[in-house]
Amino acid sequence: MTIAVTGATGRVGGLVARALSEQGVPVRLLVRDPRRAPELAATTVAPAVYGHDCAPALEGVTTLLMVSGSESPDRVAEHRAFIDDAAEAGVEHVVYTSFVAAGPDAAFLLARDHGDTEEALRASGMRWTMLRNNIYLDDLPRWVGEDGAIRGPAGDGHLAGVAIDDVARVAVTALLDPRRHAGRTYELTGPEALGLDEVAAAIGRATGRAVRYVRETHEEAVASRAGYGAADWQVAAWISTYTAIERGELGVVSGDVERITGQPALDLASVLGHA
């Protein structure tokens, strides 16, 4: 079995590549810039960029971790082209980092991209495993503005965020035993569903800052982000994260992390304590 990992210079892909290397598992690192690839034992490096011909880099690969590409209007087309390349190269199994509630009607707009990618994988003829990640707990401190506020139209909704470390551990488990996990869709969450008031309080305790959650209407959310200089689609996607929380799409706790890895999922306090 030959395993390949995309995004090996990133957070999830990097953790997966390192864990496999430490176990002595040969891994092919698929990266945009080979010069930035981590130097790990038992690894080889091949250039691969979503949106370009990746079939040569995938030749001989049997099992593949496909870390979703960067957010962009072209992401769905790039994912579909990459899946076509993987099938053409003879890849047998793809483990894909998706998102909770992925599908055409998801409140979180970028989860619709993931739904489209899942559909392409199911139709590809390759075996697949979907890792539907919740919000990364590691990223929640970035939601705090300079004024100490988390702002958005999330109402009283909750999120069951997951640690990046846990996503990587699940991915490693699936890659090492792909047949056991074939055709499975896993919901990867932490052990608790938190409202944004609770998230703000946890970040405040961990950082010593005064952090609060400010409920916004959709219109207020658009106005408060007007100075970001971001494209309209990106602002809409950011705001829809909060809308998905308000609608309850991100608030369901799953035990899949512990069931798959045998270890309890990390909670927000643990993640913040190691940040």
Where are these regions (language model features)?
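Compositionally biased, intrinsically disordered low-complexity regions
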Residues: D53, E59, A154, E192, ...
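Conserved Rossmann-fold cofactor-binding substructure of NAD(P)-dependent oxidoreductases
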Residues: T43-T62
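Oxidoreductase cofactor-interface core, primarily capturing Rossmann-like NAD(P)-dependent enzymes
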Residues: T2-L40, E59-T62, S68-R80, D84-H93, ...
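Hydrophobic alpha-helical packing elements
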Residues: D53, A57, E78, L268-V271
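A hydrophobic C-terminal alpha-helical subdomain
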Residues: E219-A275
